[in-house]
């Protein structure tokens, strides 16, 4: 009798509150919608996902094959193979003049896991994370899962999508625990220069309780100058986490391997956390990553050169397009135009109104998949990936131009004013 199940008047809800309140990634949602339309026979040009369209360099593939033949088929240390972590230590010293130990390096299943490891290891409920906008789409969800609060610092196309040191200082409160940003930036392509990082560092040195998390996954896709990092600023190396990975610079998105270099206390906490989630990363991917870090960089440079050419092509193809305000990106492989002057245009009987409706308009009328800037903390913008062929870029931009021109012809709104 006592084992009888209790009666429920409503259907059971198995999803946790944590997940129920979490928003789906808009980039992945648009990519899925684009694929579904393609499967239905529509000719969609998908500019929604940030994934290099190049093959993984041959020497990296060969290293993976050799690892299989050498039977690298066992569990690895949670933090990654020792020689791989030492390769990162060498890279940090050579590229950033930053001396770290192998114990400060942790490899994870993609830079995304590296980031969530750090946030979950450091943040407590109610902590505040300073988030310069635009920001990568997953940052806010990660902060939410860590039960912290995102404090968004807006920027504009006029500022090159960068925030000033004054804006940074004004946002700091006694609850501020972390500053999280990417450079080169996804989605804007903005690259923080040494003097800009120095200005931020001057503010942060007044607030020693703030940890800096620098997402440098686009390190190798930079069109001008050398790579700069917060760890190069005086007084910041011991309170900065650098997150990087193999996906973007080596065309290894499917290999799922990223890493964090952190203060020892943070790195140790991340190892403890990861040990309860995924344990170690793929052994074969780690051997491939070692070849990537120690091998020649000419394939990476070739990819970067191609992305620069594609950027120039996309900018040229959208030149003088009414209502299209797009700073020239200095890195990554995206355009991030402000398209807010189109919000008043009438489509399907009502104003476009917001960036999400603009992406719907472009998908339906131009058959081009883009992502709303709402997902990146910039609701007046849309993001377009240029990680595709020159022919696709030309065709996509031609379709976008034609769709907007047709919209102009059906509206009394003067977009050129």
Task: Please report, for each region that a protein language model flagged, where it lies by residue.
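PLP-dependent class I/II
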Residues: 1-15, 19-25, 30-33, 37-44, ...
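A glycine-/small-polar-enriched, mobile loop at the entrance of the PLP active site in fold-type I
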Residues: 48-51, 66-84
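Conserved N-terminal alpha-helix of the aminotransferase class I/II PLP-enzyme fold
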Residues: 75-108
């Amino acid at each position: 009798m006592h084992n009888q199940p209790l009666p429920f008047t409503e259907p059971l809800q198995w999803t946790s509150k944590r997940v129920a309140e979490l928003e789906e990634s808009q980039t992945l949602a648009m990519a899925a919608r684009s694929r579904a339309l393609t499967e239905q026979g529509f000719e969609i040009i998908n500019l929604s996902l940030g994934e290099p369209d190049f093959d993984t360099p041959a020497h990296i593939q060969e290293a993976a094959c050799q690892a299989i033949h050498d039977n690298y088929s066992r569990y690895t240390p949670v933090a990654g193979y020792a020689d791989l972590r030492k390769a990162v230590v060498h890279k940090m010293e050579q590229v950033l003049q930053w001396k770290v130990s192998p114990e400060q390096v942790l490899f994870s299943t993609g830079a995304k896991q590296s980031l969530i490891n750090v946030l979950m290891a450091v943040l407590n409920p109610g902590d505040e994370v300073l988030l310069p906008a635009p920001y990568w789409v997953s940052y806010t969800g990660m902060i939410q899962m860590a039960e912290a609060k995102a404090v968004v610092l807006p920027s504009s196309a006029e500022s090159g999508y960068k925030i000033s040191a004054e804006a940074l200082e004004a946002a700091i409160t006694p609850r501020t625990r972390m500053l999280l940003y990417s450079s080169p930036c996804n989605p804007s392509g903005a690259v923080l220069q040494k003097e800009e990082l120095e200005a931020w560092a001057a503010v942060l040195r007044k607030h020693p309780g703030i940890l800096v998390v620098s997402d440098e996954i686009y390190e190798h896709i930079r069109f001008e100058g050398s790579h700069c990092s917060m760890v190069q600023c005086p007084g910041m190396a011991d309170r900065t986490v650098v997150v990087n990975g193999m996906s973007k610079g080596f065309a290894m998105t499917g290999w799922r391997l990223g890493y964090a270099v952190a203060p020892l206390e943070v790195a140790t906490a991340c190892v403890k956390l990861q040990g309860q989630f995924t344990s170690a990363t793929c052994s074969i991917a780690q051997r491939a990553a070692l070849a990537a870090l120690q091998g020649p960089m000419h394939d990476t440079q070739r990819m970067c050169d191609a992305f620069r050419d594609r950027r120039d092509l996309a900018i040229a193809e959208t030149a003088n397009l009414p209502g299209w305000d797009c700073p020239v990106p200095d890195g990554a492989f995206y355009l991030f135009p402000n398209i807010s002057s189109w919000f008043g245009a009438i489509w399907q009987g009502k104003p476009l109104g917001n960036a999400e409706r603009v992406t719907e308009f472009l998908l339906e009328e131009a058959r081009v998949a883009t992502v709303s800037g709402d997902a990146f903390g910039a609701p007046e913008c849309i993001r377009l990936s240029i990680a595709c062929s020159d022919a696709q870029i030309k065709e996509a931009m031609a379709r976008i131009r034609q769709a907007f021109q047709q919209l102009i012809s059906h509206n009394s709104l003067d977009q050129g004013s």
